[in-house]
């Protein structure tokens, strides 16, 4: 059984897409093992995206991720990282397949509604960043 982290970004929360995103996960048989809404501080956003610290979009990304509440979830299931990434679609919504979350709801490459872990190692770090073991119901 694999786990991954999913975030509904501030634009997705603002557009009232929480239910739609959760429904898409559930329609694919993905178990939601943990879920919470929170408001990231600048320090939390910088820590979470530290891997991008030297990238030109880092400041813009952390400002955006602190611009409103987010929903963080632990998703669980067989091959859930790949399933989640397929449901999300390409980072650039213009390149995402029809019917994916980003193609259906994103407005630009940064405001692309959702974030998802890209590998088991990343998922382990990201899940631990937001959740402790007591908060995850597997």
Curated annotation (Swiss-Prot):
User: Which SMART domains does the record match to this protein?
Assistant: NDK (SM00562)
Q: Which cofactor does it need?
A: Mg(2+)
The record's top EC class is transferase
Which SUPFAM superfamilies does the UniProt entry name for this protein? Answer: Nucleoside diphosphate kinase, NDK (SSF54919)
The record's section on Pfam families has:
NDK
Task: Tell me where it resides.
Answer: Cytoplasm
> So which domain of life are we looking at?
Bacteria
The active-site annotation reads 115
Which parts of the sequence bind ATP? 9, 57, 85, 91, 102, 112
Entry EC number(s): 2.7.4.6
Q: Does the keyword Phosphoprotein apply?
A: yes
Q: Which reaction does it catalyse?
A: a 2'-deoxyribonucleoside 5'-diphosphate + ATP = a 2'-deoxyribonucleoside 5'-triphosphate + ADP; a ribonucleoside 5'-diphosphate + ATP = a ribonucleoside 5'-triphosphate + ADP
Q: Which UniProt keywords apply?
A: ATP-binding, Cytoplasm, Kinase, Magnesium, Metal-binding, Nucleotide metabolism, Nucleotide-binding, Phosphoprotein, Transferase
Which InterPro entries does the protein's record reference? NDK-like_dom (IPR034907), NDK-like_dom_sf (IPR036850), Nucleoside_diP_kinase (IPR001564), Nucleoside_diP_kinase_AS (IPR023005)
Which GO cellular component terms are attached?
Answer: cytoplasm
User: What's an example GO BP annotation here?
Assistant: UTP biosynthetic process
Gene Ontology terms for molecular function: ATP binding; metal ion binding; nucleoside diphosphate kinase activity
| Annotated function | Major role in the synthesis of nucleoside triphosphates other than ATP. The ATP gamma phosphate is transferred to the NDP beta phosphate via a ping-pong mechanism, using a phosphorylated active-site intermediate.
Outline the subunit composition. Homotetramer.
Which protein family is named in the record?
A: Belongs to the NDK family.
Full protein name = Nucleoside diphosphate kinase
Q: Which organism is it from?
A: Desulforapulum autotrophicum (strain ATCC 43914 / DSM 3382 / VKM B-1955 / HRM2) (Desulfobacterium autotrophicum)
Question: Gene that codes for this?
Answer: ndk
